[in-house]
Swiss-Prot record:
Name of the molecule in the record: Large ribosomal subunit protein uL13
Subunit-level organization: Part of the 50S ribosomal subunit.
GO molecular function, one term: structural constituent of ribosome
One GO term describing the cellular component: cytosolic large ribosomal subunit
Pfam families according to UniProt: Ribosomal_L13
Record-level GO BP terms: negative regulation of translation; translation
InterPro entries membership: Ribosomal_uL13, Ribosomal_uL13_bac-type, Ribosomal_uL13_sf
Origin superkingdom: Bacteria
C-alpha cells in the first residue's frame, strides 16, 4: 500500500523569486505570492511544514488598485487604548508606505497561526526597483503569466 509523501523540514530546498509589481493588480499579485510563500506551487506540498520560497517584490509603489479601492478600502488597527482606533485608506498606504499595503494584503491570505507568521517572514517588499538580495540570485517571475 502506498502512503502519502510528507516532506520533512531538512529535505526542503528554498528558492528566491523576484516579482515586479509595476502595473499589477494588488489582489492578483497577493494571491500568487501567498501561494508561493506557502509552497502550494510545489508537488510535495505538506500543509504543516514551511515549504514556501522567499519572494522579493520590487516597485511596490506602482501597484494598481482597481475601482474605487484607493479611497473606499479602509484598513483599521487599534492601539489597545480607549479611543485608539486608527483608519487608513489603501490609497494613503500606497502613497506613504507602499510596502505595508502589500504586506497587509499578503499576510491576510496566509494562515493565522505560527506557521503562517513564519511563512510571512519570507516576504521582502521594496517600494523602488533596488533591493538588498542580489547575493541570493533570485529568479525573475512574470506575474502576468501566472495569473
Amino acid at each position: 500500500m502506498r502512503t502519502t509523501f510528507l516532506a520533512k523540514p531538512g529535505e526542503i530546498e528554498k528558492k528566491w523569486y523576484i516579482i515586479d509589481a509595476k502595473d499589477v493588480v494588488l489582489g492578483r499579485l497577493s494571491t500568487v505570492v501567498a501561494s508561493i510563500l506557502r509552497g502550494k506551487n510545489k508537488p510535495t506540498f505538506t500543509p504543516n511544514v514551511d515549504m514556501g520560497d522567499n519572494v522579493i517584490i520590487i516597485n511596490a509603489s506602482e501597484v494598481k488598485l482597481t475601482g474605487k479601492k484607493a479611497t473606499d478600502k479602509v484598513y483599521y488597527h487599534h492601539s489597545n487604548h480607549p479611543g485608539g482606533l486608527k483608519a487608513r485608506t489603501a490609497g494613503n498606504y500606497r502613497e506613504f508606505n507602499p510596502e505595508k499595503l502589500l504586506e497587509l494584503s499578503i499576510h491576510g491570505m496566509l494562515p493565522k497561526n505560527t506557521l503562517g507568521r513564519k511563512q510571512g517572514l519570507n516576504l521582502h517588499v521594496y517600494a523602488g526597483s533596488e533591493h538588498d538580495h542580489a547575493a541570493q540570485k533570485p529568479e525573475a517571475l512574470d506575474i502576468n503569466k501566472l495569473v
